[in-house]
């Protein structure tokens, strides 16, 4: 690059000198055969000579600069080239406005809500499993205690056996007493029923007194029989006086002892 600059500058200097010589020739031709060079010509010649004198120094300086540039370029080429990682920028959507931002916010809220629900469901399941494990261990412990009690019951002491025997005897006596009471009550009911049937089978006279034999029927006055015949069918609807022996035989016994409090 420095070499090109130097060549371009040298061509400019040579072109400038050639143009000066041409102008000088033209001026000489115009003036004709003058006595000597004019002041302008002398100045042009001095400038040309100064340019030729400065050209080697400029060329040397430019050559030195070109050498330095070549050395720097060669040293830079020798160094390792560092390539940076490219950064890609997202292209903004011009149509994304407040509605898009609102949708993004709502989507984030829904995702957060789903995560919370999932976390709560996991906690509920763990709690249920813990309760099941606790109840299972409690049931096992309860069954173990029951089995231990049954095992302890097989090895009763002598006092406990004696107490159980006494309780069994009391229960047997109580059952016998209740059975005897039931038998006695049943026999009384049967006797009362038999007496009632016997009293209902005996004939009644006109006065309403039951007679046991024919002797009593023979001593009955005739006037009463005649009066009964005269009364006709209305006589059977006439109420009669209740006698004490009849009431005593037909009355049923008290049933207060048949309830659940009679055994106590």
Swiss-Prot record:
Compositional bias of kind Basic and acidic residues: 178-188
Family (UniProt): Belongs to the SPP381 family.
GO molecular-function term, one example from the UniProt record: RNA binding
Lineage: Eukaryota, Fungi, Dikarya, Ascomycota, Saccharomycotina
Self-association state and partner proteins as the record states: Component of the 25S U4/U6.U5 tri-snRNP particle, a subcomplex of the spliceosome.
Ranges of biased composition (kind: Acidic residues): 64-80
Gene for this chain: SPP381
CC per GO annotation: spliceosomal complex
Compartments where located: Nucleus
GO biological process, one term: mRNA processing
Region described as Disordered: 1-109, 178-264
Species this protein is from: Eremothecium gossypii (strain ATCC 10895 / CBS 109.51 / FGSC 9923 / NRRL Y-1056) (Yeast)
Function: Component of the spliceosome and rRNA processing machinery. In association with the spliceosomal U4/U6.U5 tri-snRNP particle, required for splicing of pre-mRNA.
Keywords noted in UniProt: mRNA processing, mRNA splicing, Nucleus, Ribonucleoprotein, RNA-binding, Spliceosome
Protein's UniProt name: Pre-mRNA-splicing factor SPP381
């Amino acid at each position: 690059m420095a070499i090109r600059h130097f060549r371009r500058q040298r061509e400019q200097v040579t072109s400038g000198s050639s143009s000066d010589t041409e102008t000088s020739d033209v001026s000489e031709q115009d003036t004709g055969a003058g006595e000597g060079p004019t002041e302008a010509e002398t100045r042009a010649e001095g400038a040309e000579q100064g340019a030729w004198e400065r050209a080697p120094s400029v060329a040397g300086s430019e050559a030195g600069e070109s050498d330095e540039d070549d050395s720097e370029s060669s040293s830079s080429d020798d160094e390792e080239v560092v390539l940076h990682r490219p950064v890609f920028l997202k292209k903004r959507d011009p149509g994304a406005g407040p509605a898009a931002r609102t949708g993004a916010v709502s989507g984030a809220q829904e995702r957060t809500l789903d995560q919370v629900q999932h976390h709560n469901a996991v906690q509920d399941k763990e709690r249920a499993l813990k309760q099941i494990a606790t109840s299972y261990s409690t049931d096992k412990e309860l069954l173990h205690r029951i089995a231990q009690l049954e095992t302890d019951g097989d090895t009763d002491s002598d006092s406990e056996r004696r107490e159980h025997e006494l309780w069994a005897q009391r229960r047997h006596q109580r059952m016998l007493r209740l059975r005897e009471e039931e038998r006695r009550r049943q026999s009384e009911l049967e006797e009362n029923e038999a007496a009632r049937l016997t009293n209902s089978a005996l004939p009644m006279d006109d006065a309403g007194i039951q007679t046991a034999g024919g002797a009593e029927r023979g001593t009955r006055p005739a006037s009463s029989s005649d009066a009964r015949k005269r009364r006709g069918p209305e006589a059977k609807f006439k109420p009669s006086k209740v006698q004490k022996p009849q009431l005593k035989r037909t009355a049923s016994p008290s049933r207060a002892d048949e309830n659940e409090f009679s055994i106590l």
